Amino acid sequence: MPPLSIVDPHIHLFNLSQGEYQWLSPNTSPLWPDKSIISHDFCQQDLLLAEPLSLSGFVHIEAGFDNARPWREIQWLEQHCFLPFRSVAGIDLTLSTALFRKHLERLTSYSSVVGIRHVLGNLSEQLCSHPKVISNLRVVNQYALIVELQLALGDMTNIDRLIELISTNTEIDFIIEHGGLPPLEQYSTQWQCWQTNLTSLAQCRNVAIKCSGWEMLNRSYQDDWIKHIISYCIHLFSSTRVMLASNFPLLLFSMQYQDYWQRIISQVDIIDQQALLHDNAILWYKIA
């Protein structure tokens, strides 16, 4: 394998002594019996890669450090990370517009912040029609930020409102996380729904997609499954709007960081590797 520089567009770092991380509690959803594997501190130095691979940057996605004061997580990151990186901050999209704008102004005062993610989970069909969500996305549009989308597309029967939100906020780049959480059962009703919804979202030019999070769906995921999903995403979005990511440290449920990247790289045509593993993340997340 020739030398390859990776920019990882989806990782989480934990500081359990300073942050809250309520979701990491063993009695809090998700109720994973092996949650103890990731219930530890993780810092940038834990993103270990050996030659011929190297890590040249990353994107940190909010991890529940402090949902009420999400800037605390950004402050910690900017004090302790030395590789080029960008951060996606947590924020409650249902806040009053005045408070939402106040939070957004504080978050964007940090140089690493390029985007936001709703702190309360998936951007559901109900949330897409929430008056506060609609008005607050107009505010985000003024800032030209990224909005990360946690979407279980196989369970969403109607994404018309989501498509409308995306189409009317053209200054926002919307990035689908974890491939829209594809169902495990190919050719099931959920699988067909996932394909249909993904096809509709791909028509929006301000939408990109990250492929990762396989271990959340199946700790023993197979190569043919992930290869099929990556190939389908490239088919819909083209190689310019697809990124491959790790979801560190959750990938540790299945394998180590080095092993993960070697496995993912083997599923991608060499002609697409530079774009999917490096260039697209720099472009979409504006990593210096």
Describe the predicted segments one by one:
Residues W71-T157, A208-E215:
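Active-site gating/metal-coordination segments in enzymes
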Residues A68-L83, T170-I176, I226-L236, Y260-D269:
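Short, electropositive alpha-helical surface patch
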Residues S129-M243:
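Catalytic pocket-lining loop regions of alpha/beta-barrel enzymes
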Residues I38-L47, R72-E73, L99-H103, I159-L162, ...:
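Alpha-helical scaffolding within the catalytic cores
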Residues M1-P9, L16-L49, G57, Y232, ...:
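Mid-to-C-terminal alpha-helical segments outside catalytic/metal-binding sites
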Residues T28-D66, P84-D92, V114-G121, L145-V147:
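Divalent metal-dependent hydrolysis catalytic cores, especially in the metallo-beta-lactamase
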Residues F14-L16, F65-A68, T94-S96, G121, ...:
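Active-site environment of divalent metal-dependent phosphoester hydrolases
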Residues V7-I11, G57-I61, F85-A89, V114-H118, ...:
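Hydrophobic faces of well-ordered beta-strands that scaffold small-molecule active sites
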